[in-house]
């Protein structure tokens, strides 16, 4: 299920575009997630009160959290699958403290792909999309395995 060197290169090329403006990408990913799947908002105490897209766009806390999410994901993607050290604390907090089900990781993965398609249509063609989906699936599968080790049935 690993990615080829060429696939990792496609992932990292598009991720370079994300890193050029992580706050706006992170904000858009979370807004896309919350709009498409309002139930996910319930896992975020500090965002539960945000009901409209305008409120979400105006929230500095949401932008800050989006930055945190994509910065962590970028660190994992750059490891090209060798992300055990980065994944362990993330899985620990998401399983035991935040109780984020694997399904929600799938939903945010879809939101990431959606935002990249929207913001970078010329740089995120079918090959890059396929590679990114594969990289995000690898991340989710490894998170799920860690969840299992921790006894979390998310």
UniProtKB/Swiss-Prot annotation:
Keyword Protein biosynthesis: no
GO cellular component terms attached to this protein's record: extracellular exosome; sarcoplasm
SUBUNIT field: Monomeric.
Chain positions with Phosphothreonine modification: 68
Main location: cytoplasm
Functional note: Monomeric heme protein which primary function is to store oxygen and facilitate its diffusion within muscle tissues. Reversibly binds oxygen through a pentacoordinated heme iron and enables its timely and efficient release as needed during periods of heightened demand. Depending on the oxidative conditions of tissues and cells, and in addition to its ability to bind oxygen, it also has a nitrite reductase activity whereby it regulates the production of bioactive nitric oxide.
UniProt keyword list: Cytoplasm, Heme, Iron, Metal-binding, Muscle protein, Oxidoreductase, Oxygen transport, Phosphoprotein, Transport
Residues bound to nitrite: 65
One annotated GO biological process: removal of superoxide radicals
Residues that coordinate or bind O2: 65
Family classification: Belongs to the globin family.
MF GO annotations: heme binding; metal ion binding; nitrite reductase activity; oxygen binding; oxygen carrier activity; peroxidase activity
Pfam family, one: Globin
UniProt gene name: MB
SUPFAM superfamilies linked: Globin-like
Catalytic reaction(s) noted: Fe(III)-heme b-[protein] + nitric oxide + H2O = Fe(II)-heme b-[protein] + nitrite + 2 H(+); H2O2 + AH2 = A + 2 H2O
Stated name of the protein: Myoglobin
Phosphoserine: residues bearing it: 4
Enzyme Commission code: 1.7.-.-, 1.11.1.-
Globin domain location: 2-148
Other known facts: Marmoset, woolly monkey, and squirrel monkey have a minor myoglobin component that appears to differ from each major component in having Phe-Lys preceding position 1.
């Amino acid at each position: 299920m690993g990615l080829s060197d060429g696939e990792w290169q496609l992932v990292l090329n598009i991720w370079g575009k994300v890193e050029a403006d992580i706050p706006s990408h992170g904000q858009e990913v979370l807004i896309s997630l919350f709009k498409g799947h309002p139930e996910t908002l319930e896992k975020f105490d500090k965002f539960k009160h945000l009901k409209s897209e305008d409120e979400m766009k105006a929230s500095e806390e949401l932008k800050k959290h989006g930055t945190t999410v994509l910065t962590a994901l970028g660190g994992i993607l750059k490891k090209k699958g060798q992300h055990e050290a980065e994944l362990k604390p993330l899985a620990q907090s998401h399983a035991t403290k935040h109780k984020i089900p694997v399904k929600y990781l799938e939903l945010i993965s879809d939101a990431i792909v959606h935002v990249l398609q929207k913001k970078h249509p010329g740089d995120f063609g079918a090959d890059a999309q396929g590679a990114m989906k594969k990289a995000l699936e690898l991340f989710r599968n490894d998170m799920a395995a860690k969840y299992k080790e921790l006894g979390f049935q998310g």
